[in-house]
Regions:
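Short active-site neighborhood of thiol/selenol oxidoreductases, capturing the structured segment around
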Residues: 58-88, 105-106
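Structural microenvironment flanking redox-active thiols in thiol-disulfide oxidoreductases
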Residues: 85-149
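Bacterial N-terminal signal peptides
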Residues: 6-16
Length: 267
């Protein structure tokens, strides 16, 4: 079921509405959410944030002359951000490259109300799952002011919207690969990431080069809504299809075993 949702929600997923009805964000709002691919665009290295240890750090200092994966989201995100980071960790675990030795990862919260304490909890969780030495000083979890977050998001081409009714954010899924100089080299979209493509992207960025513009498949995907207790139309169709396939495969497996058993008895 989780895989089916991840396959459908490739690029844009709206966080589930936990406290109110689903009419807080309109279709026009959703159309404005996404990425503007600004390949070659330098990010402002002087922008300052607070890290998970409550230290004020400049974005440029965290690059440390290495390629960097920039993940924009927020730590209290009830669904999408977890899927993005889950997919990222799965891809990273397939690489020979290591966080710290070969590249950095920077998670930045788009919620100005989130604190370094919240960031520290997420950092501990993800470093434990990544489980490779040397990542602690190179995988950063940052929080910032609304002004700083907005500037970074604008420069990165990251379009998101806050819903004051549900107190949540609608935002695109994916992450950005930066060169050691802080220029945008490539975008990755979705929640599942090809380790081979990621390896190539890191290698390309490490040489200061930029990749090409990637086609962004946009699916306005409704997901599980805790208010209605139902899945959205698109997801529901996929889940039904997966269920049918599962039943068919199970039936095929049973028939195959029965035939083998009959053959064995006949022999």
């Amino acid at each position: 079921m989780k895989l089916a949702i991840k396959l459908v929600c490739l690029t844009i997923v709206v966080s589930p509405l936990a406290q109110t009805s689903a009419r807080a964000l309109t279709a026009d709002d959703l159309k404005r959410i996404g990425y503007d691919q600004r390949i070659g665009q330098p990010l402002a290295r002087h922008l300052t944030f607070e890290d998970s240890d409550k230290r004020t750090v400049a974005l440029g200092d965290l690059l440390n002359h290495k390629p960097t994966l920039l993940v924009l989201g927020y730590y209290h995100c009830p669904m999408l951000c977890s899927l993005i980071n889950d997919g990222l960790i799965e891809a990273l675990q397939e690489l020979r490259f290591n966080v710290g030795r070969d590249f950095n990862v920077i998670n930045v919260s788009i919620d100005p109300h989130e604190t370094p304490a919240v960031a520290a909890v997420k950092k501990k969780e993800y470093l434990k799952r990544y489980a490779r030495p040397g990542a602690d000083g190179a995988w950063h979890f940052l929080t910032g002011t609304e002004q700083t977050i907005t500037q970074l998001a604008n420069e990165a081409g990251f379009r998101f919207k806050f819903d004051p009714v549900s107190n949540e954010y609608a935002h695109p899924s994916g992450f950005i690969v930066l060169t050691p100089e802080g220029k945008i080299s490539r975008y990755f979209f979705g929640v599942n990431f090809d380790p081979k493509e990621l390896r190539r992207a890191i290698a390309t960025a490490s040489n200061g080069r930029s990749g090409s513009v990637i086609h962004e498949l946009v699916l306005l995907c409704s997901h599980y809504n805790p208010i209605t207790g139902k899945y959205g139309v698109i997801v529901l169709k996929v889940l039904r299809a997966v269920s049918v396939m599962t039943v068919l495969l199970l039936a095929w497996w049973i028939v195959t075993l029965s035939r083998r058993h009959s053959t064995a008895e006949g022999g």
